[in-house]
Swiss-Prot record:
Cysteines engaged in disulfide bonds, as pairs: 265-290, 267-283
Gene: SGCG
Extracellular side: 59-291
Residues carrying sugar: 110
Role, per record: Component of the sarcoglycan complex, a subcomplex of the dystrophin-glycoprotein complex which forms a link between the F-actin cytoskeleton and the extracellular matrix.
InterPro entries attached to this UniProt entry: Sarcoglycan, Sarcoglycan_gamma/delta/zeta
Official protein name in the record: Gamma-sarcoglycan
Binding partners and assembly: Cross-link to form 2 major subcomplexes: one consisting of SGCB, SGCD and SGCG and the other consisting of SGCB and SGCD. The association between SGCB and SGCG is particularly strong while SGCA is loosely associated with the other sarcoglycans. Interacts with the syntrophin SNTA1 and FLNC.
Localization annotation: Cell membrane, Sarcolemma; Cytoplasm, Cytoskeleton
Keyword field contains Transferase: no
Family: Belongs to the sarcoglycan beta/delta/gamma/zeta family.
Main subcellular localisation: membrane
Species: Mesocricetus auratus
Amino acid sequence: MAREQYTTVTEGTHIERPESQLVHRIGIYGWRKRCLYLFVLLLLIILVVNLALTIWILKVMWFSPIGMGHLHVTQDGLRLEGESEFLFPLYVKEIRSRVDSSLLLQSTQNVTVNARNSEGEVTGRVKVGAQMVEVQSQHFQIRSEDGKPLFTAEERGVMVDTGRLRVTGPEGAIFEHSVETPLVRADPFEDLRLESPTRSLSMDAPRGVHIKAHTGKMEALSQMDIILQSSDGVLVLDAETVGLPELEQGTPGPSGSSKGFYEICVCPDGKLYLSAADEATTCEEHSHICL
């Protein structure tokens, strides 16, 4: 609203009256003023709510200057206390437990550890499942505490570097193909059995095969024939007594029918040879083989 201003003077003073001026009020009045106050109040309420939520989140998530909850940030990396669950892949350089506790990796399905090259291709994999443990790599090796190789597996073969490979199963060890070893020995006071249930058993060595029983006996049982053959050497039975208990005993035949029969003769050094059978012994006649 506008109003006219008048200037009053004392009597006898002549002052020129200024022209009439219009004066305008500056400000927000009415419903605009109430809306502005309401908007400022709403902003203040939102600010207080945000501050309260921020304080609540900091308290619930256990934020601190050294980390968040059980997750602490150290100079060596991240340190996590207690059990943790990762819903997505985890990429780290090293995972280790505390000095006084073990490291446990657990999953309801399986645990898979992959090693990748710079191109992202899998170069090694360890998969622990419910029924099997699978290792995929070009070279697999188990070392002792001092770094000595104990077990090595690769495409060329499997090598056990321990002083002794011991199989404690009741059925022993089953090999589908050949086995190369310098020594096969049973435990003390236990029997050693080499068995092939459906096929033959062969032992080959370029410098000989040595079988020895220190305190017990040695048996070779066969349903068919047992053949002891030496192509260039001799067959030596070095014992005080050589017995053939199950040797079949012959029966007298007609006289003059000794043709085609031989008798076994023994040299002083134990060498055996055959001599044509006759009514009397003929070993002395053919004893030149003992010379």
